[in-house]
Amino acid sequence: IRHLQQFLMELGKGYAFVARQQRISTETADFFIDLVFYNYILKCFVLIDLKTSKLTHQDIGQMDMYVRLYNDLKKGDDDNPTIGIILC
């Protein structure tokens, strides 16, 4: 995203950029999350999946998997549950 600062401002207060195309690995596969932010007001990670096509049930299932993996592998004990957002 070229205009990252503008994008963050549109999200609202408290967002900090963490990663772009962050890899999450399991024993059998690697997955890549388009954008990862941390909201220090909400105390949680926010995962964003960018889609260029119509939203499908598979997209929703994929985001659910990303959120569960992120909660298991990255979220700290003091963090609130991860939020997943799909932008079409």
Regions found by a protein language model. Name each.
Residues 1-88:
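Charged, terminal alpha-helix-loop-beta segments
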